[in-house]
């Protein structure tokens, strides 16, 4: 297996920037966001060869945990996709998951971020307790002055940093006014002891004197006691409060009551997310809101400060995910790589690069480049892939750039119709032997989903013991034979690919199936075998027999 193409170009770009602008950039100021551990393993192997092994490397989830400050219990990034695939197969797609898809789309949108911004604005207005800062009955600063500092004077900082600045301000004010307070206490002491004598006079004198002495010693405690009246929460508690109290009430003000579909999505999003939070469970789409709230309230660690970020498989991230990366990293310097034709996470990802650029980067210079020439796979294989992706509806196809293969090698595609699963396994084994005999090192048997792959693995392990099932938790792979679901194969390349069963039951003419089959086909660099039982999928070209 190899990870080449766009990723390799990005890594060489990092090396170029570091060596060409060594005074401006340090390796540790670069970050790569990769889709999975496979990519990270490949990257960590290739970066030392480029001399830039200090570059930070994360999956989006791991970076989110770094920002939030704790690891969250989150399902595998592909779990929702698996659910979609399975429900499409059993025919209950519309009934079971339509609302789930729409929830993901809305949660990944800039609109959802805008509601969180409005919520944080409301929190900001109530953050400072409505009371003056006093020492006993002596007013140091009134509420309006302190609130003005928080809302306006220090508004470029996160909430926690603002409080730190206000603490400095209160300290300065306290010191300025402490002499007046001490003078008042001395006057009060004089009046208090004026008509007293003996022991009683001495006790009252000592009490006032101790209070005067404590002012200078205890001013830090006095300030801390005041600031501790601020009821702070962590980002999860704020997110929960947003969903429980703010979101539903305020969205009704902005949505026409006739827009029942959006109201239904919002209510489902709210109830489903709160139910998950109650069980300390989170979805991938919750990470951007949590990161954003954490950044606005608490801020982030210095080690998250990055000057340039590379985002691979970018088509699978939504607008909110990109926006939060831009905001947190405080940088518009990005290399964004993606292929909409491989956008299997369509329920949250990018469908139109132009719109994406207009939304996310409308205020900066953007260089948009398409890579059309492909040197990895053959013309025969790429022609089939292009014909498959051509099944997409017109409005989706217009944003897809078809690959133009350079290598013109004949007999790189083999296809066969089989009568049953037993015959299928036998044929797969025969093709593996043939490929290994011809010196090919990496061979992938690609099934549509994990269920199909588990069954293939179970059956083929009866006749050979060198086949490994990839389930998404793996962090590395060194050649050999693997069984891999189509959605996990994305971004990877193999010498030979065997598509286990491209029949009409597995792959229908819908956006997801078209993209999954396209991904599977384009993983092959030298040889592509397509098998199917009964009738072949209608999205395969006619010349596949």
Description of each model-found segment:
Residues 28, 37, 44-45, 49-53, ...:
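Conserved helicase motor core of SF1/SF2 NTP-dependent helicases
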Residues 6:
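Rossmann-like NAD(P)(H) cofactor-binding subdomain of soluble oxidoreductases
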Residues 18-310, 316-324, 332, 366:
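Alpha-helical nucleic-acid-binding subdomain
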Residues 9, 13:
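Hydrophobic positions on the alpha1 helix immediately C-terminal to the Walker A/P-loop
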Residues 2-3:
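The conserved Walker
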């Amino acid at each position: 297996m190899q990870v080449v193409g766009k990723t390799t170009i990005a890594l060489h770009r990092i090396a170029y920037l570091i060596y060409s602008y060594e005074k401006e950039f340090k390796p540790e100021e670069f970050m790569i966001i990769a889709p999975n551990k496979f990519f990270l393993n490949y990257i960590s192997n290739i970066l030392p060869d480029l001399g830039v092994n200090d570059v930070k490397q994360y999956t989006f989830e791991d970076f989110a945990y770094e920002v939030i400050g704790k690891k969250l219990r989150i399902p595998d990034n592909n779990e929702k996709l698996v659910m979609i695939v399975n429900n499409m197969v059993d025919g209950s797609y519309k009934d079971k998951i339509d609302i789930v898809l729409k929830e993901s789309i809305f949660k990944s949108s800039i609109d959802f971020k805008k509601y969180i911004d409005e919520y944080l604005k409301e929190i900001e207005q109530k953050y400072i307790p409505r009371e003056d800062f006093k020492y006993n009955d002596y007013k140091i600063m009134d509420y309006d002055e302190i609130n003005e500092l928080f809302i306006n004077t220090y508004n470029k900082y996160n909430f926690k940093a603002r409080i730190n600045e206000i603490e400095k301000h209160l300290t300065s004010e306290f010191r300025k006014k402490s002499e007046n307070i001490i003078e008042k206490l001395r006057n009060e002491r004089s009046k208090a002891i004026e008509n007293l004598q003996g022991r009683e006079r001495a006790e009252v004198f000592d009490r006032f004197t101790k209070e005067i002495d404590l002012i200078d010693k205890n001013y830090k405690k006095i300030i801390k006691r005041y600031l501790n009246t601020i009821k702070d929460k962590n980002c999860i508690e704020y997110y929960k409060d947003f969903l429980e109290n703010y979101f539903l009430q305020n969205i009704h003000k902005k949505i026409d009551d006739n827009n029942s579909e959006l109201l239904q999505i919002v209510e489902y999003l709210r109830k489903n997310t709160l139910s998950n939070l109650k069980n300390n469970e989170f979805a991938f789409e919750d990470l951007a809101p949590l990161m954003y709230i954490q950044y606005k309230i608490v801020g982030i660690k210095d080690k998250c400060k990055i000057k340039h970020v590379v985002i691979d498989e970018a088509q699978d991230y939504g607008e909110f995910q990109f926006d939060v990366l831009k905001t947190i990293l405080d940088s518009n310097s990005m290399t964004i790589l993606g292929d909409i034709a491989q956008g299997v996470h369509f329920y949250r990802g990018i469908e139109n690069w132009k719109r994406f650029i207009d939304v996310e980067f409308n205020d900066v210079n953007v260089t948009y480049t398409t890579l059309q020439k492909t040197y990895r796979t053959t013309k025969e294989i790429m022609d089939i892939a292009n014909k498959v992706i051509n099944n997409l509806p017109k409005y989706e196809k217009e944003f897809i750039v078809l690959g133009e293969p350079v290598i013109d090698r004949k007999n790189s595609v083999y296809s066969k119709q089989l009568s049953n699963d037993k015959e299928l396994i036998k044929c797969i084994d025969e093709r593996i032997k043939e490929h290994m005999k011809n010196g090919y090192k990496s061979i992938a048997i690609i099934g549509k989903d994990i269920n199909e792959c588990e069954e293939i693995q179970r059956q083929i392990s009866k006749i050979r013991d060198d086949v490994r099932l990839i389930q998404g938790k793996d962090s590395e792979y060194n050649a050999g034979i693997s069984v891999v679901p189509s959605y996990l194969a994305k971004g990877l390349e193999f010498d030979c690919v065997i598509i286990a069963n491209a029949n009409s039951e597995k792959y229908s003419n819908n956006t997801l199936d078209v993209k999954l089959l396209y991904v599977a086909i384009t993983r092959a660099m030298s040889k592509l075998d397509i098998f199917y039982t009964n009738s072949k999928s209608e999205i395969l070209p006619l010349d596949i027999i």
